[in-house]
A protein has these predicted regions:
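Extended ligand-binding clefts on enzyme/binding-domain cores
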Residues: 26-31, 35, 58-62, 143-323, ...
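Short glycine/serine- and small hydrophobic-enriched flexible loop segments
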Residues: 69-76, 125-135, 189-196, 256-260, ...
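Inward-facing hydrophobic residues that define packing positions of alpha-helical scaffold repeats
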Residues: 85, 130, 143-146, 150, ...
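Aromatic-rich carbohydrate-recognition surfaces in CAZymes
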Residues: 58-65, 113-134
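Second-shell loop/turn segments in exported
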Residues: 54-58, 70-74, 113-117, 136-138, ...
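C-terminal functional modules
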Residues: 298-369
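N-terminal Sec-pathway targeting helices
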Residues: 1-12
């Protein structure tokens, strides 16, 4: 009997040892997403559901509200989800059912909307989260809130350019002759869900145009990476020779959006886009560095290794090279996770969002259900 117990304990020990070695090899460090989420709420969220950016005088954006909806939905935190959406609706809603993108303190010290223009990426994320909440929690109120927003996105934030319908960055930009486009706003998985609940519009056309323009604009950069912004003028795609034409803090989200669509649907058009992470895999293997800001001509803009961008890249890199993804994760992500539940800079709101999203996706979870 004693021998049997010893054998059992020995087998358990060996199993634990093997798992520990495998975890170390493949980057399974089980960083506590709940702990990070709670720290995020403590650091950024007011009692009434407003997300504040400490690096921008505690201002609030529709993007920040949307990101908190994504996180709270992913962790099944209905109470926080409702709190954040209620604040968003009460304080950022426009007459057309979209949301003002910037809210904060004016020159007189009064808190109000500072810029009433919309931001289509946030509007899309909010509507998507409401539909996802409806499906997850089976509450009709979320569907009733989502449908008018979806219709307003179509009516106010899309524009036909030649043979293609394109997503505009906001309401004001739809009236300009020179069309400015942010490709990181393209959200094919959201458009597919909108189609499910809106049979009046062809949202699949917007899926198609998203992939068309992503492919077209990425073919014009030497790195093959998407730019932060591009222009459409006289039917031609133009990438500006400035930071707006760089692959940087905005453009990194293209990988999040396309990866999410690929994981949900297996979309074949996503593959050539996601394969561009091989650029970073090659850089890592030769330099052990992962610089994240590149000009469209292929040259480095600077030697910034923005940890938020790296976090978004790792799940995509994992599709093509698990070993390299694990190396980067161990070297560039794990050391920055603080005991208080935040990564690297406690006050960098944008980096902490991207880090949380990247970590969630890297640990084989579907961020956007």
């Amino acid at each position: 009997m004693v021998k049997n117990n010893i054998l059992i304990f020995a087998l358990i020990f060996i199993f634990i040892l093997i798992f520990a070695i495998r975890a170390s090899t493949f980057g399974v460090y089980n960083l506590d997403l709940n702990k990070s989420y709670n720290a995020y709420k403590k650091d950024y969220m007011s009692k009434d559901g407003r997300i504040m950016d400490p690096e921008r005088d505690n201002s609030t954006t529709s993007e920040g509200q949307a990101y908190m909806l994504i996180m709270s939905h992913a962790l099944n935190d209905k109470k926080t989800f409702d709190l954040v959406y209620t604040w968003t609706k009460n304080n950022l809603s426009r007459k057309d059912k979209l949301f003002a993108w910037l809210w904060g303190k004016n020159q007189d010290g009064k808190y109000q909307i500072l810029d009433n223009n919309s931001a289509s990426d946030a509007d899309i994320d909010i509507a998507f989260c409401l539909l996802s909440a409806y499906e997850q929690w089976n509450d009709e109120k979320y569907l009733k809130e989502a449908v008018p927003i979806i219709q307003a996105i179509w009516d106010k934030e899309t524009k036909r350019v030649g043979n293609h319908l394109i997503l505009m960055p906001g309401v004001k930009q739809t009236t300009s002759e020179k069309i400015e486009v942010n490709p990181s706003y393209f959200s094919p998985y959201s458009f597919r869900l909108f189609q499910k609940y809106d049979d009046k519009h062809d949202w699949n056309e917007l899926v198609d145009s998203s992939y068309f323009y992503l492919s077209a604009v990425m073919s014009k950069t030497r790195t093959g990476l998407p730019p932060n912004w591009f222009l459409i003028q006289n039917g031609q795609i133009i990438i500006e020779d400035s930071k707006r034409g760089d692959f940087s803090y905005d453009a990194i989200r293209v990988f999040w959006r396309v990866y999410s669509d690929y994981k949900r649907t297996g979309e074949k058009r996503a593959v050539p886009i996601l394969e561009k992470v091989n650029f970073f895999i090659d850089k890592w293997k030769t330099t052990q560095k992962l610089y994240t800001n590149y000009q469209s001509n292929g040259e480095l803009r600077d030697k910034d290794e923005f940890v938020g961008s790296i976090a978004i890249l790792i799940p995509v890199i994992k599709l093509y090279d698990k070993k390299t993804a694990a190396e980067i994760y161990k070297s560039e992500i794990v050391p920055y996770f603080a005991k208080d539940g935040y990564w690297q800079n406690k006050h960098n709101y944008y980096a902490r969002n991207l880090l949380w999203f990247g970590e969630y996706m890297y640990t084989n979870k579907s961020l956007l259900k």
